[in-house]
Amino acid sequence: QWPRPQIPP
């Protein structure tokens, strides 16, 4: 697993 990019709402 790797840090997923944070997607704004």
Curated annotation (Swiss-Prot):
GO terms for molecular function: peptidase inhibitor activity; toxin activity. The modification Pyrrolidone carboxylic acid is found at residue 1. Keywords: Hypotensive agent, Metalloenzyme inhibitor, Metalloprotease inhibitor, Protease inhibitor, Pyrrolidone carboxylic acid, Secreted, Toxin. Expressed by the venom gland. One of its GO terms (biological process) is regulation of blood pressure. One of its GO terms (cellular component) is extracellular region. Its main location: secreted. Belongs to the bradykinin-potentiating peptide family. This is Bradykinin-potentiating peptide 9a. It comes from Bothrops neuwiedi (Neuwied's lancehead). The lineage of its organism: Eukaryota, Metazoa, Chordata, Craniata, Vertebrata.
